[in-house]
Amino acid sequence: MPYAIDLFCGAGGCSEGLIQAGFHILFSSDISDMVEVTYKHRHEQLGLIQGKNTWFERSDIRDLTGETIRKHIAELEIFKQKDIPEIDLIIGGPSCQGFSRAGRRDKSDPRNMLFGEYVRVINEIRPKYIILENVEGFVDMQFMGYVGLTGITYPDGTVTPTILRSELNEIGYDTLEPRVLNAADFGVPQRRNRIIFMGYRKGLTPPEYPEPTVKPENRLTLLDAIGDLITDPLKRASINPHPTQYQLDSINGRTPTVDGNPIPAKKLTNTELPKQTDIVRERFDLFLPGESGSNLKKRVMEIGIDISDKPALIELCSNTLNLQPEDVITLFKYPGATKEQAEVLLTKKNIRQRWAPNQPSATVVTIADDYINPWESRTFSVREMARCQSFDDSFEFLGKRTTGGLLRRKEVPQYSQVGNAVPPLLAKAVALEIIKIL
């Protein structure tokens, strides 16, 4: 049985993929108490019991040592009066907020330094193989005066991969060139590019990156993933009359328990939908499949749009623009509305988008407020987002469903747990490459 450690484990996307590939997770760690509840609950479902055959440690990685990890593994019941095994793989995705191209980037963000702590733990545990996963922005993040684990001071402007490869080489690990993998190429119904960095202890067989398992023309679509979760029964029967194989796999389960059998979903969890006002619902109605907020605004101004069946929007625009309701309808029905007038109708937000049903989803993020369901004028449930990430339906996300404001800095509610996760099927594809050479 190959053994793995999952650091920065989050809700457990990587762990799901590793277990599907055949690994046993002996130790995992994350800093979030919200994540801990979800992660432990799932592992109990799978027969991975705290203190018996696995250990989760809620900890800042800066406080986590190889000695602590070895101690917890040695105390597991399965190793009673036995030597603890060599660790085959450490996998981890250091917090990526400072690297991300999806939002603001801050070179001084202390979270950018966590990959150095990851290298430290690798050096203290000495696994056979290592995998680091992160956002694409990881590869071109520059550091100023970075001092490595071995005391090397790197020139200002040195990029992360250069530092990482040098640091790993200094502690006895060779590395492959980092590669961008798209989750959609590995059976995930989502366009999600992630940088994967693989390393191996010097003298061992080098791993390879996985080749795509799905051709571009055969990528799974949003309809394949969540068509059976349409809430309107008549619409669901018309659009998704028969479950797809992906839907069946999600329902029946992919991740095996310690007994080797996946867990079918007895009931669907995480299906609660956000409450929406009439104005928001009517705005969502205006979007065509695949259309962004900026393109909708352009269409309103250059072509016109019929809002005669949108009473809440008519009233809003009438009051704000000081026009009679019939004049509001006429204003937007034909070309010529100004940008300011269009923004009263639509708001100034340009990032909203109605996802297209016949394509993989866009990248699932931690805030789902601006993504619109293709068949119903609403945002997505946590379960729908989890389906797009390739989580089993039996995987239940616990804790608060969402959060806001300054609490986003420390809380990891359900939507964030899903959006931060590595898609299990992507993690599985990479982990299988390690299994091949062990």
Regions found by a protein language model. Name each.
Residues 253-438:
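C-terminal target-recognition/interaction regions appended to catalytic cores
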Residues 30-34:
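Short beta->alpha hinge that forms the Motif I/post-I loop of the SAM-binding pocket
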Residues 8-9:
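Class I SAM-dependent methyltransferase "Motif I" SAM/SAH-binding loop
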Residues 12, 16:
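Glycine-rich SAM-binding Motif I of class I
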Residues 1-5:
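Extreme N-terminal starter segment of soluble prokaryotic enzymes
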Residues 70-84, 94-336:
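Class I S-adenosyl-L-methionine
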Residues 17-23, 42:
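A short, Lys/Arg-enriched amphipathic alpha-helix followed by its capping loop at the start of a domain
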Residues 38-78:
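S-adenosyl-L-methionine
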